[in-house]
Every structure is written in C-alpha cells, then in structure tokens.
C-alpha cells in the first residue's frame, strides 16, 4: 500500500472515529460524514485511474451526486431541527419520544 492510499485511508478512519465520538450534535455528524465521502471519492478516483478501469469512470461522479444529495438533506434536517427545538442535538431526532 502506497503512502497516498494510506493517508486517504487514515482520513477516512479519522472521520469515522469523529462520527462515533461527536455524535451528539447534528452539525459535527454531518461534517464527519462529508469527510468520509470526500476520502471515498479520492480513493475511488485514484483506484480507477491507476488500474485503468474504463467502465467505472462514472462511479466517482455518481458518488459525488449522492454526497450532494446527502448534504442537502442533512442541512435541511439541521435547519428544521434547529428551528423547532432551538438546538442541533441528535437526541431531538428520536421519533419514539413524546
């Protein structure tokens, strides 16, 4: 494994650990998810370019489309929760609470 792949894998790991540690606020969870998607995009693009996968050239673009949709939905959920409850705690998203 080259150093570049190792650094990208470490970026994914740090984002994942951040998602596990800072899951009380919705904004920090969304930022960690975006970091994970960015590292996946870079890893996928480099793998496709290095291995000359001509059939999979559109896969990073599709991943970016899904990441943009995820970010838009996450930000709209953040705005809705912060307007309703005044905070961005993830505990407010539990539908089973009264």
UniProtKB/Swiss-Prot annotation:
Name the source's superkingdom: Eukaryota
Keywords of the record, alphabetical order, are: Electron transport, Membrane, Mitochondrion, Mitochondrion inner membrane, NAD, Respiratory chain, Translocase, Transmembrane, Transmembrane helix, Transport, Ubiquinone
* Catalytic activities: a ubiquinone + NADH + 5 H(+)(in) = a ubiquinol + NAD(+) + 4 H(+)(out)
Could you mention a single GO BP entry for this protein?
ATP synthesis coupled electron transport
One Pfam family here: Oxidored_q2
Subcellular location(s): the record lists:
Mitochondrion inner membrane
Output the Gene Ontology cellular-component terms.
mitochondrial inner membrane; respiratory chain complex I
Enzyme Commission number(s) from the entry: 7.1.1.2
Query: What class does this enzyme belong to in the EC scheme?
Result: translocase
A GO MF term: NADH dehydrogenase (ubiquinone) activity
> Major place of localization?
mitochondrion
Has the keyword Nucleus been applied to this entry? no
Bilayer-spanning residue ranges: 1-21, 29-49, 61-81
As for membrane topology, the entry says: Multi-pass membrane protein
Q: Which family does it belong to?
A: Belongs to the complex I subunit 4L family.
**What assembly does the database describe for this protein?**
Core subunit of respiratory chain NADH dehydrogenase (Complex I) which is composed of 45 different subunits.
Function comment: Core subunit of the mitochondrial membrane respiratory chain NADH dehydrogenase (Complex I) which catalyzes electron transfer from NADH through the respiratory chain, using ubiquinone as an electron acceptor. Part of the enzyme membrane arm which is embedded in the lipid bilayer and involved in proton translocation.
What protein name is recorded for this chain? NADH-ubiquinone oxidoreductase chain 4L
